[in-house]
Structures are given as C-alpha cells and as structure tokens.
Swiss-Prot record:
The lineage of its organism: Eukaryota, Metazoa, Chordata, Craniata, Vertebrata. GO terms for cellular component: CENP-A containing nucleosome; extracellular exosome; nucleosome; nucleus. Residues 1-22 are annotated as: Disordered. The modification N-acetylserine is found at S2. The modification N6-(2-hydroxyisobutyryl)lysine is found at K6, K10, K37, K75, K76, K96, K119. CDD domains: HFD_H2A. Belongs to the histone H2A family. This is Histone H2A type 1-B/E.
C-alpha cells in the first residue's frame, strides 16, 4: 500500500486545436460541427472542415486587405461597410462571386456616363487662331 499507483503513468499532452494544427485562425471544430448539423451529407470527412475553414479564411483575408486599402485611400483608420463595398465591387473576381450580395450601408460605385460630362470646347481654340 505505497500509494504510488498513478505516479508511473504519462501525463496527458496539452490539447492542440485542429485550427492550430492546420495553421489557421478560423475554427475547424466549429466548421465541422456546422457541416454535421447542416444535413449536407450523412458523413463528413476529417479533411473537409479543414479545407473549408482555410477557404473561408483566405476569402476573408482578401476582402479585409482590399477594404483596408480602400479605408487608407479615404484617410480613415476604421473599415466601414462603404470600404467593403468599394473593395468588392472594384475587384473583378470578388464582384463576380458576390454579385448578388447587397451590403447594408455600402452605397454605390461612383460612375458618371461619358455623355453627361462637360464637353471640351475646341471651337474656342479655333476662334483665337483666326
């Protein structure tokens, strides 16, 4: 009865999230849970949530980078919905992907038809030449 029953066993390793194993910020475990609960299929493989989380993280980073550039162009330090709208609509691929998406408080792209712009008068220069 020395009481040394548990001393020889190995200590349990520190838990490591699947996100950190994959080198991601997005939660792989939550994506896996949502895939299972969403009735997309009967079974969900181990790699599917990792891949989906990586894709979502990449798209988010891409949009945030472009929106940050738009905010900096407008001399602002905080990204607002207007900056998201400008970032998405000025990027051809993101605009195609999110073409049917409405961003609240996003506004519209500035666009003036060429016909409506004031005409450059060349007759004024010709009149001086006479």
């Amino acid at each position: 009865m020395s009481g040394r029953g548990k001393q020889g066993g190995k200590a349990r390793a520190k838990a490591k999230t699947r996100s950190s194993r994959a080198g991601l910020q997005f939660p792989v475990g939550r994506v896996h849970r949502l895939l299972r609960k969403g009735n997309y299929s009967e079974r969900v493989g181990a790699g599917a949530p990792v891949y989906l989380a990586a894709v979502l993280e990449y798209l988010t980073a891409e949009i945030l980078e472009l929106a940050g550039n738009a905010a900096r162009d407008n001399k602002k330090t905080r990204i607002i919905p207007r900056h998201l709208q400008l970032a998405i609509r000025n990027d051809e691929e993101l605009n195609k992907l999110l073409g049917r998406v409405t961003i609240a408080q996003g506004g519209v792209l500035p666009n003036i038809q060429a016909v409506l712009l004031p005409k450059k008068t060349e007759s004024h220069h010709k009149a001086k030449g006479k």
